[in-house]
Curated annotation (Swiss-Prot):
Record-given protein name: Pimeloyl-[acyl-carrier protein] methyl ester esterase
Primary location group: cytoplasm
Broad enzyme group: hydrolase
Organism, as annotated: Escherichia coli O17:K52:H18 (strain UMN026 / ExPEC)
GO CC, any one term: cytoplasm
Gene3D superfamilies reported for this sequence: alpha/beta hydrolase (3.40.50.1820)
Keyword Coiled coil found: no
Enzyme nomenclature, EC number: 3.1.1.85
Length: 256
């Protein structure tokens, strides 16, 4: 049985769907879900194959987006963190009428480094794929440690992420592998030039996975979008800076 796990909280007049990153699940939002559900009708989702959304194998980005969309409200602000940012972006591209605003958090339209494009070296992503088959729990933990490195609260932030992972059964190796394949191969830089809904991009200055150098490059490529950098955050600004993060979303709600 392959059902998407979906939880709805709050009764705000605007729907907000939160999509988590690679290796994780919707429990990662527990640090902000109370605050956000007082302003929005909040939707917490486990991506296909992750957390409680069992019974899925490795999916393409397009299939992942379609699977999530099946249970979604007619119209919502879609927020995606990291890998989830690609899923939210894909939904904005294929079903713009369902997307009131697009928010990407510590996400890149092209995670993999390319010619004159900063990102994760492809051999690093390939290395993670290789290590998954050897010791996938340790590989996921290494990936999580990378996400909080450099912040003042790095240790406790990493603990919060690890707790999220361990709270639920680990995803299957092929699901994790499929997620890494998306990070390694997808490039939405050009397609996202054409989205017309409000588009907010949030970054961490200390992020080791999405280099801050991409921010001005995307400002130029997508002049209709807005960007904001959390000065002391790494890859998970909603964990290190929850109050500031929520304020940004409440401010966006006033504008849509």
């Amino acid at each position: 049985m392959n059902n998407i796990w979906w939880q709805t909280k709050g009764q705000g007049n605007v729907h907000l769907v939160l999509l988590h990153g690679w290796g994780l699940n919707a429990e990662v939002w527990r640090c902000i879900d109370e605050e956000l559900s007082s302003h929005f009708t909040l939707h917490l989702v486990d991506l296909p194959g992750f957390g409680r959304s069992r019974g899925f194998g490795a999916l393409s980005l397009a299939d992942m987006a379609e699977a999530v969309l099946r249970q979604a409200p007619d119209k919502a602000i879609w927020l995606g963190w990291s890998l989830g940012g690609l899923v939210a972006s894909q939904i904005a591209l294929t079903h713009p009428e369902r997307v009131q605003a697009l928010v990407t958090v510590a996400s890149s339209p092209c995670f993999s480094a390319r010619d004159e494009w900063p990102g994760i070296k492809p051999d690093v992503l390939a290395g993670f794929q290789q290590q998954l088959s050897d010791d996938f729990q340790r590989t996921v933990e290494r990936f999580l440690a990378l996400q909080t490195m450099g912040t003042e609260t790095a240790r406790q932030d990493a603990r919060a992420l690890k707790k999220t992972v361990l709270a639920l059964p680990m995803p299957e190796v092929d699901v994790l592998n499929g997620g890494l394949e998306i990070l390694k191969t997808v490039d939405l830089r050009q397609p996202l030039q054409n989205v017309s809904m409000p588009f907010l991009r949030l970054y961490g200055y200390l992020d080791g996975l999405v280099p801050r150098k991409v921010v001005p490059m995307l400002d130029k490529l997508w002049p209709h979008s807005e960007s904001y950098i959390f000065a002391k955050a790494a890859h998970a600004p909603f964990i290190s800076h929850p109050a500031e993060f929520c304020r940004m979303l409440v401010a966006l709600k006033q504008r849509v």
